[in-house]
Amino acid sequence: MMPSRTNLATGIPSSKVKYSRLSSTDDGYIDLQFKKSPPKIPYKAIALATVLFLIGTFLIIIGSLLLSGYISKGGADRAVPVLIIGILVFLPGFYHLRIAYYASKGYRGYSYDDIPDFDD
């Protein structure tokens, strides 16, 4: 069995590399090499960030209601841990959703590459 060839510069197997023949009258440049490929959107990471954001928001609201006394089960001894966990869950969700929003709107300095992806 013959091993598959790889592009030595990038280590990509040759079966996944797209080649196109250059015309002999051209100066060696084609439009394809200057086109940017569309960004890969990390849907799983955005879904996880949304879940973290919603759970964190819910825990912050519940912790605030416990602390203020509107919910009378437990008092401040239960409110503070709920608030801390809510903040710890809320912050990464909010951060990654903000990056995803700015990347989708095309703001400069933001891209989907900034969001960690779960490559299977």
UniProtKB/Swiss-Prot annotation:
GO cellular component, one term: endomembrane system
Keywords of the record: Cytoplasmic vesicle, Endosome, Golgi apparatus, Membrane, Phosphoprotein, Synapse, Transmembrane, Transmembrane helix
Membrane topology term: Multi-pass membrane protein
Annotated transmembrane regions: 46-66, 79-99
Protein name: Transmembrane protein 230
Protein species of origin: Rattus norvegicus
Localization of this protein: Membrane; Cytoplasmic vesicle, Secretory vesicle, Synaptic vesicle; Golgi apparatus, trans-Golgi network; Early endosome
Cited InterPro entries: TMEM230 (IPR044234), TMEM_230/134 (IPR008590)
Gene name linked to the record: Tmem230
Residues that bear Phosphoserine: S15, S23, S24
Listed Pfam families: TMEM_230_134
